[in-house]
Every structure is written in structure tokens, then in C-alpha cells.
A protein has these predicted regions:
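Feature captures hydrophobic
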Residues: 1-171
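Short, Lys/Glu-rich amphipathic helical modules
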Residues: 419-437
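Charged, alpha-helical scaffolding/interaction elements associated with membrane systems
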Residues: 98, 110, 427-429, 496-497, ...
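Extended non-globular scaffold/tether segments
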Residues: 401-412
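Hydrophobic side-chain positions on well-ordered alpha-helices
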Residues: 107, 421-426, 490-494, 775
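Generic structural signal for well-ordered, non-membrane alpha-helices
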Residues: 87, 102, 127, 412-423, ...
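Conserved catalytic cores of very large enzyme subunits
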Residues: 174-399, 432, 436-439, 443, ...
């Protein structure tokens, strides 16, 4: 019989007894109740794993073991336990017992709870607990949502009619313009001011549905790829031979594309859907898919970004999909191969950096013009010719064969769509819709196998290819590129066939509707994120960046008819995805174009993002890229520049909390929130170890270098995991360089390779360093020890010092030359350090200073700073100065503009 009484010899607490008692209840439930026990048996067999529970001082140390369909409790933690939950204290353990799911997330984020070992088994364990406690958890979550709604209503009790009236007024007060752009051939009023959303009932219906849709977890992709792998093997094939990774992926991809449902969305002009649901969340099992295992019952009830899920999807994911992929995903592959390395442990504490390669490597832009101009059949012919070259080795031939298999799969899907469109047309009673479906069937017989001939075919080819790319790579940051440039030739070719002004006007309206339909199709999917990510990233969308305007590869004006058509659609729909970016080149692009960008941004109150072409080209030029390719850049994901169709830039490989390095420098290498003596010991402030400001700056950079080195180490390991678990042969066929090299894009096949980091907290670090330099060393108004004590106590005991910091120190954004120089010093150090690190795919590591919504998450996980920012408050977003830096917005703008590109 299990002894549940605390053992004084082991110094275990009463909490240990309490936890063992509760675990015994859990074990009894799964042992005695068939309705619970059935969840322990999956297609892979019994769920066999051990979960340990302990505290930092080991006052609690016990485990629950699931094996052979039975559960038992141990009074110790076996060495072979798959996962151990480590609580900061007994109080934290007790807190978890009454915690809501949201409370549990914040316990992880705030280091009251950390995890050692296999995250998948942790999620499986919490799923089993949710089976047992389903009703209680759902009740808690409903209460949380009610409280959240109440708080929101308290902050804004009534609808802001003044704001909605203002936006409506902006939409009514649209500008007109005469065409002044040399490459705009057919738009007399390039602003297309006569059109409103009311002129496009199809688009208005789509938009209304989008604004009320709740995404649903879609099981199609994981079901099909899991089925194929179970039949054909993963590590080895049916005959026991090791799979070549790209070939394995390509065969599975082809099976997926041949067997997924060909759906024509209701009333759409475009063929195909990203998922089998009207708006679906794709489960990528080798990426981050298994992270929602613990939420299969609760995901419809969470406060932020709830997703619906059917009973059948829940059953399929738990019993068939997740057990198969539990060890075959990026995170766990690295953990097993490299024995839970320190770099991974740091990432899983959430407060220092986050590595996106745990989920995807998809921040890039495919060469869409290639498939539009050649069609898949000609691409296959070219790749086949490359395979026959005598200098090709076995690995290169396998990679090239994998590209062919993927292109064949894409063609099969397009043919299936053609057949579906034909069937839908035969059943359609409305003659107008019937004709549209018949045209769709014809288009899908032409593209993607053959070149596009019309704008209608080109947009359909784009969309089908886009679906195909998202069947291979996660829908996060994969971007669309310069669609106005790539679609303009088809627009011109169509217009040249039309003679009468009336027909041309009707065609322009149809082109607007077609592009609008494309925008709305891009909203038919949503990233599948665990609830923790909602607090970490703020519910980010897929970030499908689209880029307009700027200059051509030759340096000429790139603004054309399609540029303005895309801007019209952007104005009317005002969507966050696609993420529209506009390039503007001074002295090349017209004032007409610039005014239109400003007008659309004003009407939508959000978009497009506007980029100075000259500054971006200047920033990219030192990288050694061909100038024509630099001029052809597009935004990726959020705003990051990538060379279109030639560059695996993975511009957002990681989110880096630079403030963590500052905190560690202030604490001799210890990270305060995690209470972890992590970095090098660089000096104790209280002991007066820093005689000069430069000595402290050196300590800061040493801590930052330590964090960067660990993050890059993890990035390399995850890159290796991608090469084995999920090479991307279809994407590789659309990135220049891969075919010539016979290499997958994950293995350095692209013509240009790089990875980019998003550094968060530049203004906060700069201001903190300015306070230390000016008040401690230059003016000697406060000792470093006194400043640190104020920081450690959140300035609660020294409001006078807080006022001095905020009002008497020249901060970034105040107009101070010295503050700008400090910001440039910090940014240059980061740039130079990353630039010197060898890249596993070749190329460079690049730096950027933007934050998505990470400035909030990292700020929540950081203490007070010398800058006067208080504990838990958000950092400033991107390059934005502190709000108290200056009363003048112009000072803020000028200081940001004076940062070195």
C-alpha cells in the first residue's frame, strides 16, 4: 500500500502529502473508470510516461506513472521520468491547485513553475487532467471570459460613436487624382474614388462573414500526413531503409495534395481553400501542433482567440496524430539529440528569447513569377534535365526528385479543383454563378500546370500555389511579395484585348473584385497557437506580407495600374491580413502615389505600412547582394526586407529580450525573474566593481553576448531538426539557387541565405544606460548602489530619484545627440556581434529592432529599470521612444530617423 504520510527524513512538506493524495485520486480514476481509461490507449499503443512533481528545495518530490493502461503514484521521482514540473515553492504548488488555466500560464511565464524534460508529455498529462476536470475547467474559463468582458466594458462602457463616425467620414471624403505615373496605363483616376465596398456585394458578403467567423481546428492535414507516414514509415521506409528526408517529405506532400478535399468557397472567383473549414486553423504536427494537446477540451472556451473544435477532430488528434508526432517534432528532436541543452532550457523560461524555428522557418518570399510564366510542367522538365547532369550526386538527385514530386502533387490538386468546379457548375441553378464555375474549371485545367494567360488565371495560379505552400510550411510569415509587379503584365494583356471604354471600365471593376476576393481568401486560415502564445504574442495573424510600389530592379518607377488596384482593395476591406506594405522612393515615385498611400492609411487607420526605399536599399547594400536583387526587395512577415524569390532570410528567427542582458549585468549574471545564475559573473554593483561607465557597458555586452551565443546555438540545432524532420522541397522549387545546387532551401539551397533577429527593448536599454552614465558617472548625483536599490524596489522608496531619472536625464527621443549616440552604440554592437557569427546555411545573421507585441510580454517578465520604467510594464514597441522622453513628437521622430541604417 502506498505510504502517503510525509517522511521527516526527506524533509518533505505537508504539500507533498497533499499532492500525492491528489495524484492517487487521478490514478484511481484512470484505473477504475473505463470512460477515462480509454484515453490512455492510442493507435501507437498505451500512453506510457512518467511525470514528476517537485519544488526547488525538494520539499515536494513525487511522481505519477502511466504504463500499460494503468496509473500509479510514487513517493519519489524516477531518473527516467519523461518530464518534471518544478515549482518555486510549496505556495506555488498550492496556487496551481486552485489556478484557472490563465493563472497556470502566468505561473509558467513568471517562473513560479518551470518544466524540465519532454514538453509533449507535459501537454499529454495536462490533457488527461482536463479529461478528469473538464467541467470545472470550462466553468472557470467562462468566468474568466465574463470578468474580462466586464473589465473591457468598464474601461469603455459605451461604443465610441465619435470614432466610428470619424472613420465613416474619412471613407466618404475620398480624394480624386489625375494620373501622373508613367506606368499607370489605364486608370484615369488612379485613386478609383468612384468605387466603394457597396459596389462589390460579393466582397461585402465575404467581409461580413469574416468579421463574425470563429476559426475551427482543421484535422485534414495532420490526418492525411500521419496516415501516409504510418503506412510508409518515418525514420525508415517499408523495407527498413533510412528515408532521405526530402523524398520522404515530398511523397507525403504529394499524397496530401492528391487526397485533400478540393473545395470552391461559396461564391468565390478563386478555386481552393487552405483548410476543409470555412476558416480553419492548420495543425502542423512536426512543428507546434502538439502544443495544443492539453487544450483539446478547453480551446473553445479560452478568453483570447478561442477556436472551435469538433468531437471527431479532438478524437483524431489525441488518439491518432499527437502520439505519433510526440517525439517527431522540432523541439523534442533537439531535446533528445542534444540532451536538453542549456540553450533550449533558456528558451523555455520565456523571459530571455524565443526561437521561431521551433514552429517554422517560413519567413521568405517564393518566386511566384516562375510558376506564372512557366507552369509546373515546364518547371518539372527543367528540374528533370538538372537531375540528368553527370556531376549530380545521389543527395542532389534526391532533392531534385523531391521538388518534382511536390510539383506533381500541386498539379493533381489543381486538376481536382477543375473537376470540382465542373461538378459545382452542373449543379448550379444561377446562370451567372454557373458561368463563373465553368470559367474556374477551365482556369484550373490551365494553371498551375501550364502558364497563366490572363489576370483571372494568374490570380488563381497564385492562390492555388499559396495553398500548396501552406500545406508544406506553417502559415506564419510566409509572404506574397510584389504582386502589383507580377500581375501587371496580365492586366495589360487583358486590357489590350478590349476596345470600348465601357468594357474597359467593367474590366477594371472586375479586376478590383478579383483582387478583393484574393484578399478575402487569404483570411480563410489562422495560425494555431496555444493559449500561452496569446499572452506572449498577442494573437498575431499569419502576417502574409504583400508589397507595392517602389522601384524596379533597374531603378525605375515601379508604380503601375495594379499598385492602385491593390490600394483600392486595401482601402475598402481594411484587413490586417494580407499585411500590405508600400515602398516609396523619393524623387522617383510620384506625389500622387505618396498622397494615395497616406489617404489609404488614414481611411483604414492602420495600413499600408510605408517604407522609404532609399533607406532600405542603403541598409541592404553592405550585405553584398546584387543591386538589382536589392531593388527587388519585399517585406516579409511584419516589415522585414527580403530579396524576392531568391532569399531564405528567416527574418524573424527569434525574439530577443535585450533588457534581460541589462538586468543580468546589474545582477552579476543572475537573471532576476527566473532567479537563475545564468550568465558570466561580470561584477557586483553594490561592491563598486564598475569604476567607469565603459566598464559597466562592457559587462552589459558580455551578458548580451552570452545570451546571443546560446540563442544561436539553439537556432543551429533547430535548423538541423528542420533539415531532417521537415525539409521543404516545394518551396525550394520556387527559390532561386536550390535547383542549381540540387539542395533543399533548409540546407542552404537559396541563392542568398541569412537569419534575422528581432531585438526588443532598444529604447529601454538606451535610456537605462543614459541614466547610469549621466547620473552615476558624469554628474555623480546618485551612487550606482543607490540607483540599483531603487530599481530593485521598483522606485517605491525613492520617488524623488524616479522624478530625476524621468525629467532630468536626456533620453532617446528627447532630441539629445548623446542619447542618439548611445542608441547607435548599442545597436552597432548588436549588429557587429551577430554579423560575425558563422551561419549554418551560409550568409549572415542580421539584426532588426521591432517587437510584434513582444514588448508587452518581455516587459511583463522584467523588473524595474534605471530608465524609470516600472516593474512589469511594457517596453516601448520597436524603436519608439519612452512617452516621457519629450513633450514634442518631432523630437521622437528626429531621434529615430538619426539611427544608423
Amino acid at each position: 500500500m502506498l505510504n502517503l504520510i510525509p517522511d521527516a527524513k526527506t524533509k518533505k512538506s505537508f504539500t507533498d502529502y497533499l499532492i500525492r493524495t491528489l495524484l492517487a485520486v487521478v490514478a484511481a480514476g484512470f484505473n477504475l473508470m473505463p470512460s477515462l481509461n480509454r484515453y490512455l490507449k492510442t493507435e501507437e499503443g498505451w500512453l506510457d510516461f512518467t511525470v514528476g512533481i517537485t519544488t526547488e528545495n525538494e520539499s515536494v518530490a513525487c511522481a505519477i506513472v502511466f504504463a500499460g493502461g494503468k496509473a500509479k503514484v510514487l513517493g519519489e521521482i524516477p531518473k527516467q521520468a519523461e518530464v518534471v514540473l518544478i515549482f518555486k515553492s510549496d505556495a506555488a504548488v498550492k496556487k496551481l491547485l486552485g489556478a484557472t488555466p490563465t493563472d497556470q500560464i502566468f505561473m509558467l511565464l513568471n517562473s513560479e513553475l518551470r518544466v524540465r524534460g519532454h514538453m509533449g508529455y507535459m501537454n499529454a498529462f495536462f490533457f488527461l487532467l482536463s479529461v478528469l476536470m473538464n467541467k470545472k475547467q470550462i466553468s472557470q474559463m467562462k468566468k474568466e471570459r465574463a470578468v474580462s468582458k466586464k473589465e473591457l466594458l468598464k474601461s469603455e462602457p459605451e461604443k465610441r460613436k465619435d470614432l466610428s463616425d470619424e472613420l465613416a467620414s474619412r471613407r466618404r471624403s475620398r480624394l480624386k487624382a489625375q494620373n501622373t505615373d508613367a506606368n499607370v496605363r489605364y486608370l484615369d483616376d488612379p485613386y478609383l474614388s468612384s468605387f466603394t465596398i457597396e459596389d462589390f456585394p460579393r466582397l461585402k458578403t465575404f467581409l461580413d462573414a469574416h468579421l463574425s467567423a470563429i476559426p475551427e481546428v482543421c484535422p485534414e492535414l495532420p490526418s492525411l500526413v500521419t496516415r501516409w507516414h504510418k503506412q510508409n514509415g518515418f525514420e525508415t521506409d517499408k523495407d527498413g531503409r533510412p528515408w532521405q528526408p526530402a523524398l520522404r517529405k515530398a511523397h507525403a506532400y504529394k499524397y496530401l495534395m492528391e487526397n485533400r478535399r478540393p473545395i470552391i468557397a461559396e461564391n468565390s472567383l478563386l478555386a481552393g481553400t487552405t483548410t476543409s473549414r470555412p476558416v480553419g486553423c492548420i495543425v502542423y504536427p512536426e512543428g507546434s501542433g502538439t502544443l495544443i494537446w492539453n487544450e483539446l477540451f478547453t480551446i473553445p472556451h479560452r478568453t483570447h482567440n478561442p477556436f472551435s473544435i469538433s468531437d471527431e477532430t479532438r478524437r483524431l488528434l489525441h488518439f491518432e496524430v499527437f502520439p505519433y508526432w510526440n517525439r517527431r517534432n522540432f523541439r523534442e528532436w533537439v531535446r533528445e539529440k542534444y540532451s536538453n541543452p542549456l540553450c533550449q532550457q533558456i528558451d523555455e523560461r520565456y523571459a530571455l528569447y524565443f526561437s521561431w524555428k521551433q514552429a517554422t522557418i517560413s519567413h521568405t518570399i517564393p518566386d511566384f513569377p516562375k510558376i506564372l510564366k512557366l507552369g509546373a510542367s515546364e518547371m518539372i522538365a527543367q528540374i528533370s534535365a538538372e537531375m540528368e547532369k553527370p556531376e549530380r550526386d545521389e543527395q542532389q538527385r534526391a532533392n531534385l526528385e523531391a521538388m518534382i514530386l511536390c510539383l506533381e502533387g500541386l498539379c493533381a490538386y489543381s486538376k481536382n479543383l477543375a473537376a470540382q468546379a465542373k461538378q459545382d457548375a452542373e449543379r448550379e441553378a444561377n446562370p451567372v454563378r454557373k458561368q463563373e464555375l465553368e470559367e474556374l474549371a477551365k482556369a484550373c485545367h490551365q494553371v498551375v500546370e501550364k502558364p497563366a494567360r490572363t489576370l483571372f488565371e494568374a490570380v488563381n495560379a497564385m492562390w492555388i500555389t499559396w495553398i500548396g505552400l501552406h500545406m508544406e510550411s506553417m502559415n506564419a510569415g510566409l509572404s506574397l511579395g510584389r504582386l502589383d509587379q507580377w500581375l501587371q503584365p496580365y492586366f495589360l494583356a487583358d486590357m489590350e484585348k478590349i476596345s470600348s471604354p465601357e468594357e474597359k471600365a467593367a474590366y477594371i471593376k472586375k479586376a478590383i473584385e478579383l483582387v478583393g476576393d484574393f484578399f478575402m481568401r487569404c483570411t480563410d486560415h489562422f495560425p494555431l497557437t496555444p493559449d500561452l502564445a496569446n499572452f506572449y504574442f498577442g494573437g498575431s495573424s499569419s502576417d502574409q506580407a504583400l508589397t507595392l510600389g517602389g522601384v524596379t530592379p533597374d531603378g525605375g518607377d515601379a508604380v503601375n495600374d495594379m499598385t492602385y488596384i491593390f490600394l483600392k482593395v486595401t482601402e475598402m476591406l481594411s484587413l490586417r491580413d494580407p499585411n500590405v506594405n508600400a515602398r516609396y522612393m523619393p524623387e522617383v515615385n510620384s506625389d500622387t502615389y505618396l498622397k494615395r498611400l497616406c489617404e489609404v492609411n488614414l481611411i483604414t487607420a492602420a495600413t499600408p505600412s510605408m517604407h522609404n526605399d532609399r533607406a532600405i536599399i542603403s541598409a541592404l547594400s553592405p550585405m553584398g547582394y546584387d543591386i538589382r536583387d536589392i531593388r527587388d526587395w519585399s517585406a516579409t512577415g511584419c516589415v522585414e526586407p527580403t530579396l524576392s524569390g531568391k532569399h531564405l532570410s528567416h527574418t524573424n528567427m527569434q525574439m530577443m529580450n535585450m533588457v534581460a542582458a541589462l538586468e543580468m549585468a546589474l545582477n552579476n549574471g543572475r537573471h532576476p525573474l527566473t532567479d537563475w545564475q545564468l550568465g558570466p559573473q561580470t561584477g557586483i554593483v553594490e561592491n563598486g566593481d564598475f569604476r567607469t561607465f565603459d566598464e559597466f557597458f562592457d559587462a552589459f555586452t558580455r551578458q548580451f553576448a552570452f545570451i546571443i551565443d546560446r540563442s544561436i546555438e539553439y537556432n543551429h540545432m533547430l535548423g538541423e531538426a528542420h533539415q531532417y524532420l521537415r525539409p521543404t522541397p516545394f518551396l525550394s522549387s520556387l527559390i532561386e539557387g536550390c535547383i542549381d545546387k540540387g539542395a533543399d532551401v533548409t540546407g542552404g539551397g537559396a541563392r542568398y541565405n541569412s537569419s534575422g533577429t528581432a531585438i526588443v527593448g532598444l529604447a529601454d536599454v538606451t535610456d537605462s544606460l543614459m541614466v547610469i552614465k549621466k547620473l552615476v558617472y558624469d554628474e555623480r548625483k546618485v551612487t550606482f548602489a543607490a540607483l540599483k536599490e531603487a530599481v530593485d524596489t521598483n522606485f517605491e522608496n525613492d520617488p524623488a530619484l524616479l522624478a530625476l531619472v524621468r525629467k532630468k536625464t536626456p533620453l532617446f527621443g528627447s532630441g539629445s545627440e548623446e542619447a542618439v549616440a548611445m542608441a547607435n552604440r548599442v545597436a552597432k554592437w548588436a549588429h557587429d556581434y551577430y554579423d560575425a557569427i558563422p551561419h549554418y546555411r551560409g550568409g549572415k545573421y542580421t539584426t532588426g529592432f521591432w517587437s510584434m507585441s513582444q514588448h508587452v510580454a518581455f516587459g511583463t517578465l522584467s523588473g524595474a529599470l534605471p530608465s524609470g520604467r516600472l516593474r512589469g510594464k511594457p517596453f516601448t514597441p520597436g524603436l519608439t521612444p519612452q512617452p516621457f522622453a519629450s513633450p514634442s513628437l518631432l523630437d521622437n521622430i528626429r531621434d529615430v530617423a538619426r539611427l544608423d541604417p
